């Protein structure tokens, strides 16, 4: 039995470290009276929604304005004095105190990156004090569901310097019997795709999230390549491995029109384009198919495709329960992407996941394009029984770190482990 005094926060430290793009981010450490400690590093996005919590940067010339020394200062000089002496096991209280200390809705005073680093480090310190893995501490004895991975193997948009408008083209190995098998299937298609690209004289350089970033004629060419790679690797498209898209359409939405390819599309035309893709390819999930502010367009998209595929709100919902409730009230989308740094605390993240599940929406735990070796989201996916995780391709160690953590969790769970795809969970559209 652990002594309650062992859970008391003794000290909090922070440091400036680098993310996978070589940009600064913040790492926090929380030390408890009993000797346990927790550490967390915050990721950073490239294509960020306008309604995300505020990521604080230093400005100036150092690190081209992207330094986070002010964030470090806020953690050590303002947050630490307010939290030391409190119990690390009272996550809700810890997060609420930081939110009140900041005093703004989007956390612009202290910075969501400051608050989130401490929030996750606190949870990790408590889990370590109890001698529990993070997924068990945040979850419950029933938390044994391993997520279906959405593997970003072709990068475009803001994540790559190529001519693809859509940001991510993903493999979804839902037909596997275990997470380990799903990872193998994805890796085999990834390497098959690399050879196909090489044989065609196309680049096999990778983008921010570890996927290939070739210059292809259009989005359809990416779909064709993926289907070909799946088949050549020995799998059945649509039965064992399907496709998912992150359109990231806010990035090319200007003056009420969607600018991509050689055209300019209204919301109605954009919906028609997405319907064509769903009919052409084994697509079961579309993320941010329309812009974050195009609510009427989203209503149409959901009406047309909501019963066929998973429609995911990322920039649309930004892991925010207020925006998610608005979407639910208007019957918009049927899934939410969960990014911890979009909202800035672990408590609010868990609230968004809980709301989505209670209202019949699926949830996908997601990385950011600027990632680190921190594997919290792998544990979070299992803890919340989310059923899906999006953490990049099968290359770059900051992406693979999450997959490897899920392999460890699957081993720890043993016979209890259940792969979401094997029991018909995961993205909508698997039965189409």
Curated annotation (Swiss-Prot):
Active site: 209 (proton donor), 339 (proton acceptor)
Presence of keyword Secreted: yes
A cellular component annotation (GO) from this entry: extracellular region
Keyword Endoplasmic reticulum: no
Keywords: Cytoplasm, Glycolysis, Lyase, Magnesium, Metal-binding, Secreted
UniProt cofactor note: Binds a second Mg(2+) ion via substrate during catalysis.
Enzyme class (EC, first level): lyase
Main localisation: cytoplasm
First and last residue of the signal peptide: none
Function field: Catalyzes the reversible conversion of 2-phosphoglycerate (2-PG) into phosphoenolpyruvate (PEP). It is essential for the degradation of carbohydrates via glycolysis.
PANTHER family linked to this entry: ENOLASE (PTHR11902:SF1)
Designated name of the protein: Enolase
Name of encoding gene: eno
């Amino acid at each position: 039995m652990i002594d309650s005094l062992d859970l008391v926060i003794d000290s909090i430290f922070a440091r400036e470290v680098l993310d996978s793009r070589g940009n600064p981010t913040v790492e926090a450490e929380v030390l408890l009276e009993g000797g346990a400690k927790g550490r967390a590093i915050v990721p950073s996005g490239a294509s960020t929604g306008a309604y995300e919590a505020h990521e604080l940067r230093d400005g100036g010339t150092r690190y081209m304005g992207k330094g986070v020394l002010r964030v470090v200062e806020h953690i050590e000089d303002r947050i630490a004095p307010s939290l030391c002496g409190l119990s690390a096991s009272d996550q809700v209280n810890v997060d609420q105190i930081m939110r009140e200390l900041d005093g703004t809705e989007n956390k612009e005073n202290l910075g969501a990156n400051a608050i989130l680093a401490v929030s996750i480090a606190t949870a990790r310190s408590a889990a370590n004090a109890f001698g529990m893995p993070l997924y068990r501490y945040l979850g419950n004895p029933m938390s044994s569901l391993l997520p279906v991975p959405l593997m970003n193997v072709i990068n475009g948009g803001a994540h790559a310097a190529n001519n693809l408008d859509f940001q991510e083209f993903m493999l979804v190995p839902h037909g596997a019997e275990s997470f380990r098998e799903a990872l193998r299937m994805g890796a085999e298609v990834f390497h098959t795709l690399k050879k196909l690209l090489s044989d065609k004289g196309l680049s096999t350089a990778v983008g921010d999230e570890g996927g290939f970033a070739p210059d292809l004629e259009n989005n359809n060419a990416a779909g064709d390549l993926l289907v070909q790679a799946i088949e050549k690797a020995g799998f059945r498209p649509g039965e064992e491995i399907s496709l998912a898209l992150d359109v990231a359409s806010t990035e090319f939405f200007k003056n009420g029109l969607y600018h991509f390819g050689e055209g300019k599309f209204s919301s109605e035309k954009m919906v028609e384009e997405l319907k064509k893709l769903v009919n052409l390819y084994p697509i079961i999930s579309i993320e941010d198919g329309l812009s974050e502010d195009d609510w009427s367009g989203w209503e149409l998209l959901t009406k047309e495709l909501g019963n066929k595929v998973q429609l995911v709100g990322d920039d649309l919902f930004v892991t925010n329960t207020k925006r998610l409730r608005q979407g639910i009230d208007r019957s918009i989308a049927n899934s939410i992407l969960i990014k911890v740094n979009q909202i800035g605390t672990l408590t609010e993240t868990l609230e968004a996941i809980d709301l989505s599940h209670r209202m019949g929406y699926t949830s996908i735990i997601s990385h950011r394009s600027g990632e680190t070796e921190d594997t919290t989201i792998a544990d979070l996916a299992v803890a919340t029984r989310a059923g899906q995780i999006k953490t990049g391709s099968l290359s770059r160690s900051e992406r693979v770190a999450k997959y490897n953590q899920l392999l460890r969790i699957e081993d720890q769970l043993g016979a209890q482990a259940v792969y979401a795809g094997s029991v018909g969970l995961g993205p909508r559209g698997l039965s189409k």
